[in-house]
């Protein structure tokens, strides 16, 4: 679609994949949405096509998750359309000892949508694994 319609048209469709409904509907986040939409629209078409194709064509790594032996934190937004909770939970169960954190009111870009929650969860995780490395 990007090749034929261009970034401006496609970027409107991408926003609900990247961001949760809370972010997309919050009046106080209007400037943030505008900035992100502008960034999406300014992406080069060729690079975006290659990146999208890479995501679609990549091989799954689920079978390899069980070999991870390092402390692992999986973060998912409760409004994530790109990687829904059930996929994140599946990864969590596949990685022994991993921690799964759900960010309330966030989609796939939880670090932008709810940075305070993400930083809190990340800080707690890092505190627990202090000395591991």
Range-by-range predicted roles:
Residues 14, 52, 91, 118, ...:
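Hydrophobic "lid"/C-terminal helical patch
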Residues 96-133:
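Catalytic active-site module of serine/aspartate enzymes centered on a nucleophile-bearing elbow/loop
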Residues 81-87:
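Conserved alpha/beta-hydrolase "acid-adjacent" motif
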């Amino acid at each position: 679609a990007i090749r034929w319609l261009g970034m401006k048209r496609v970027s409107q469709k991408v926003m609900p994949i990247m961001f949760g409904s809370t972010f997309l509907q919050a009046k106080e986040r209007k400037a943030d949405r505008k900035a992100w939409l502008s960034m999406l629209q300014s992406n080069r078409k060729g690079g975006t096509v290659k990146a999208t194709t890479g995501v679609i064509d990549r091989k799954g790594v689920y079978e390899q998750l069980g070999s991870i032996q390092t402390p692992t934190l999986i973060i998912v937004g409760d409004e994530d359309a790109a990687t829904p909770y059930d996929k994140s939970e599946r990864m969590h169960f596949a990685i022994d000892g991993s921690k799964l954190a759900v960010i309330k009111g966030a989609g796939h870009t939880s670090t932008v949508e709810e940075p305070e929650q993400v930083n809190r969860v990340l800080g707690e995780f890092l505190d627990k694994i202090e000395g591991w490395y």
